[in-house]
Curated annotation (Swiss-Prot):
Name of encoding gene: folD
Keyword Transferase recorded: no
Domain of life: Bacteria
Listed name of the protein: Bifunctional protein FolD
Entry keyword Lipid metabolism: no
Pathway: One-carbon metabolism; tetrahydrofolate interconversion
Amino acid sequence: MSAKIIDGKQVAQTIRNQVAAQVQQRLAQGKRAPGLAVILVGVDPASQVYVGSKRRACEEVGFISRSYDLSATASQEELLALIDRLNDDADVDGILVQLPLPAHCDTTQVLERIRPDKDVDGFHPYNVGRLAQRIPALRPCTPKGIMTLIETTGVKTHGLHAVVVGASNIVGRPMTLELLLAGCTTTTCHRFTQDLEQQVRRADLLVVAVGKPNFIPGEWVKPGALVIDVGINRLADGSLVGDVEFETARNHASFITPVPGGVGPMTVASLMENTLSACQDYHDQAL
């Protein structure tokens, strides 16, 4: 059996088209376009690529995009002051601080400074807590995008045994919460997990987010499993691979995301959805 490939690019394009149509509808009603402020500290090449893709997506859907590029030596006080100004700006619906930050910045303090109703990345403890309480508001973008991809397969998640490999605050932990909300029996594996192979082999739904190339051997994948590969790793020859050994895994799985072109585009598409939601759900009423 060969798995069906879940085309994240296509699904993400559909979402962007839907968001763009809603923006045009807003403008036709005399309402303003949603606004997203993107803050980049320093000149990390990978971060610049990610920020560029987010800015292009804003242009495509018709958002007002604002860019704030601070030097790597900018103080935490400068960054917090900028966030405070954007929190008070009625034309800004979403504030995104590109991670990672320079070592002298306290990431937790910076993310907590963003107003929860403008936290379109979904990283604020308030929004993660809402998800844990089963009343999600602005949901973390990558897990949100993954749930959208799973929905497109038609696979019913209730009762599935889901395994998440990786426990980061950005993907692994909120992904576990999303899968619990979707009715899965969910196991989270991390650096201290003793029996990783056995856990992976039991997974009806496998999500891997560790940032290590081909970390999960394809033969570990349970026959018929749905595999979501969040990792994107560049090898010495310049090629991109995920955290799962793709060619072997696709012969076991029923559905699998490719790398690139799987989860990555969905993260940005979910950011567009969150920004529109923040505008409509929280800020329109303030006008």
